[in-house]
Regions:
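N-terminal presequence-like segments and the immediate start of the first folded domain
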Residues: 1-33, 71, 94-106
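Membrane-proximal amphipathic alpha-helices
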Residues: 88, 92-93
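Short, solvent-exposed loop/turn elements at beta->coil junctions and helix N-caps
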Residues: 6-9, 82-87
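Short, well-ordered alpha-helical segments
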Residues: 21, 26, 34-81
């Protein structure tokens, strides 16, 4: 599955547009990791626990979007974008959306 943020794929032509596909995940913070994050906020630096959590969330949301696209017969997804939103205190949603298409070599 080709997944790109651009509106086209070099060397490919879009032969069919299938529509919007999406994948999301909602993650809650972990109290133990929050304690480590508080210390990082005091001394500065990257909060690796949150970086890892966001990376895992992004991969899961992308995998779910790909499954959505495969179910409708797509072999590529274009115009992919991500967004996050706060669901509740301590929980956030990561949403990935794109346009499912069928592409062929030019």
């Amino acid at each position: 599955m080709l997944v790109v943020s651009s509106h086209d794929i070099p060397g490919k032509k879009i032969v069919k547009t299938l529509g919007l596909v999406k994948g999301n995940t909602i993650r809650a913070r972990h109290i133990g990791k929050d304690i480590l994050a508080v210390f990082k906020n005091i001394v500065g630096g990257e909060i690796q626990e949150y970086t890892k959590l966001m990376a895992e969330s992004r991969e899961q949301a992308i995998d779910r979007m790909i499954q959505d696209a495969e179910q409708i017969g797509a072999n590529a997804i274009i115009s992919v974008s991500t967004t996050t939103s706060v669901i509740s205190q301590g929980a956030a949603e990561l949403l990935v959306i794109g346009t499912a298409v069928v592409v062929e070599d030019e």
